[in-house]
């Protein structure tokens, strides 16, 4: 049995979970999320808890059970409290600005980079060039943050680039003079 998959998922107040036709729908204060359900796993909603139950006990299915439990738990957390990711832009002349749903980045290239934000993701840029991304879909939020970071990943010598706020860059020593 999957240890993660066996844990029940608490349903907060003002959050509604429904399962129909192999699709799980979670609706809460911040919005609504839908996801297809794996055919080898069932969701049982009892009171204010959701449990993920495998249809057949097999090793691969218990792995899927843990995955589905994590995905549904992220959906419940997303529609009730939401997710947040902070990126830092480091470097001389590097800056970030927000124009509507487009993030304008100056990253040391010969041209500015315009990054359109996907629907469901909101961004804020403060004076210290910190980009705060928020959304209810954890998967979409993480992919958006990774795509922005990939535009100019941090380099190990001076630390210039875009990095996650909690990320620690291991610095290398540069060349020593003659």
From Swiss-Prot:
**Which pairs of Cys residues are joined through disulfide bonds in the record?**
none
Entry keywords, A to Z: Ribonucleoprotein, Ribosomal protein, RNA-binding, rRNA-binding
Please list the GO terms describing molecular function.
Answer: rRNA binding; structural constituent of ribosome
Do you know which Pfam families this protein is assigned to?
Ribosomal_L6
What would be one Gene Ontology cellular-component term for the protein? cytosolic large ribosomal subunit
Specify the superkingdom. Answer: Bacteria
HAMAP family tied to this protein: Ribosomal_uL6_B
Record's function text: This protein binds to the 23S rRNA, and is important in its secondary structure. It is located near the subunit interface in the base of the L7/L12 stalk, and near the tRNA binding site of the peptidyltransferase center.
Under the subunit heading, UniProt states: Part of the 50S ribosomal subunit.
> Can you say what this protein is called?
Large ribosomal subunit protein uL6
From which source organism is this entry? Desulfatibacillum aliphaticivorans
């Amino acid at each position: 049995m999957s240890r993660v998959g066996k844990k029940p998922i608490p349903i907060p107040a003002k959050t509604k979970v429904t399962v129909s036709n192999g699709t799980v729908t979670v609706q809460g204060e911040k919005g609504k999320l839908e996801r297809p359900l794996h055919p080898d796993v069932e969701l049982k909603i009892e009171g204010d808890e959701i449990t993920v139950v495998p249809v057949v006990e097999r090793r691969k299915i218990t792995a899927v059970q843990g995955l589905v439990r994590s995905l549904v738990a992220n959906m419940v957390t997303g529609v009730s409290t939401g997710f947040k990711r902070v990126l830092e832009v480091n470097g001389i002349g590097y800056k970030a600005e927000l124009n509507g749903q487009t993030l304008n980045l100056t990253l040391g290239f010969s041209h500015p980079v315009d990054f359109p934000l996907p629907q469901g993701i909101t961004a804020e840029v403060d004076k210290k060039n910190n980009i705060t991304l928020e959304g209810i879909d954890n998967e979409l939020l993480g992919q958006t943050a990774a795509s922005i970071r990939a535009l100019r990943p941090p380099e190990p010598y001076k630390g210039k680039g875009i990095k996650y706020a909690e990320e620690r860059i291991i610095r290398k020593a540069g060349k020593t003079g003659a």
